[in-house]
């Protein structure tokens, strides 16, 4: 099997297993490079931008965990560490760097955005771990009855 064929197969497999995760990640990339947003009443909320970052990344990582837990019977902690925690944080950093350097000043990269993103990812991981424990507890409880 050639590398190109393997890559396409892997992508198709991931798309089938994690469609909502891929949709969330794609949406983050799109929203990160939209040159402007219309004004809303929420603009007056203090730190609304940071809350938005936290919710986007926390929600995305929660979705990654939920889709993972639906497809797997056991946790691969190493895989989850890399793909459901580290990769989104690295992606966030890359996006912030690209916003600062490649958007003709229509967007800016900010350290506090990166911090909000990383906090969201970490909260998403905590939610995922809690869901994993609930899944194991329910499985164990059903086995006892």
Model-predicted segments: where are they?
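Bulky hydrophobic segments
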Residues: 2-112, 118-145
């Amino acid at each position: 099997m050639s590398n190109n064929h393997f890559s396409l197969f892997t992508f198709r497999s991931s798309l089938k297993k994690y469609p909502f995760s891929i949709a969330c990640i794609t949406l983050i990339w799109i929203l990160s490079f939209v040159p402007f947003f219309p004004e809303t009443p929420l603009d007056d909320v203090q730190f609304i931008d940071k809350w938005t970052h936290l919710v986007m990344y926390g929600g995305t990582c929660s979705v990654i965990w939920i889709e993972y837990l639906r497809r797997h019977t056991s946790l691969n902690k190493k895989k989850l560490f890399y793909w459901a925690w580290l990769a989104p944080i690295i992606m966030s950093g890359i996006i912030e760097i690209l916003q600062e350097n490649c958007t003709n000043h229509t967007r800016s990269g900010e350290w506090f955005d990166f911090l909000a993103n990383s906090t969201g990812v970490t909260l998403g991981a905590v939610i995922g771990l809690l869901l994993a424990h609930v899944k194991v507890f329910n499985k164990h409880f059903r086995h006892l009855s």
